[in-house]
Amino acid sequence: RITTVSRSYASEIRMPFYGEGLDGLLRARSKQLSGIVNGIDYNVYNPKTDKDIAVNYSVEDVIKAKAANKTALQKELGLEENPDAFMLGIVSRLTDQKGLDLVECVLDQICAEDVQLVVLGTGEGKYQDMFTYYSRKYPERVSANIFYSEALSHRIYASCDAFLMPSLFEPCGLSQLMSLRYGTLPIVRETGGLRDTVTPYNEVDGTGTGFSFTNYNAHEMLAIIRYAKKTYFNDRRAWNEMVLRAMKQDFSWDASAREYEKLYDGLIEEEARRKEAIRLQQAREAAEAALKEAEKALELAKRAEEKAIRKFSGIEDETEDERTETAEVEADKTPEAAPEPEEVTEVLETPEEAKEVVTKAKPEEKE
């Protein structure tokens, strides 16, 4: 069995782009391939008890607490203090794989609109410089924190309204799970674990726990950011309901462990079935062999019975070879032909001698 960290990624790695040269093998083993998403520690990432955030909260009071945490973070980072501002967070390695080349293409447009952007992380120099530049260009809208702080990451999860993850590929992803836990709605590209853990918002039936876009395209990403911002400002009720649904999701390790338990139980049952199938096959083969032996013994017994009956009746039970041999013996007993009389070769010289021979050969007359 082969396991990976999400169902979608288990499908993706069967394709050349994601398979890294192993796609052919993984396609051949597709029936043995499973995907189970990672979990996060719900004790560590718990807005109700988190000591690193300004105001603790739960599902019951998340809306008010979000505004208070946002204001506290704005003050900490030197952003404009506005609880109604649309705050977008990024906590990530700053690399191409995380989709930051898409962000680079449209960052000017994002910052020019009514959006606050908070970035935390380190990585490639070009992205570090990019965010630093925009934080200086838009000091009240962009905060670039080019380092990593666990405590600050918790405050970003608790304070932001949305969390951006436009990854090129993402086997599972953890940041979107943390943001869901804190009621921050993920904006993700539909790949790997991001597809499996974030349900895109559907305004028709009022479902969803975040926002998503399909193609690896900067303008498609920008469009979904604008859609999220529009929903936040124009339909706050739908937004707040989505926040509640997000917080009620269970992506704890307990949930992941239950999935692994099901997988391993299935493997145990599968192995038991395999062994039982082998046992039944062996039993079937043994029964077939015993049946053949019984049939052979029955045939021998039948022949012995027939032979005994013939013997009791005075009939020799001759085999074909025996009958052939008997015929040959009888043929040898045929009477021999009588020998022909010997030819008379004596020469008679006188009439008296001839008369004497005739007299001897003539049978005597009975009186």
PLM region spans:
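Catalytic cores of nucleotide-sugar-dependent glycosyltransferases that transfer UDP/GDP/TDP-activated
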Residues: 1-332, 343-349, 353-367
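Intrinsically disordered, low-complexity proline-rich regions
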Residues: 336-340
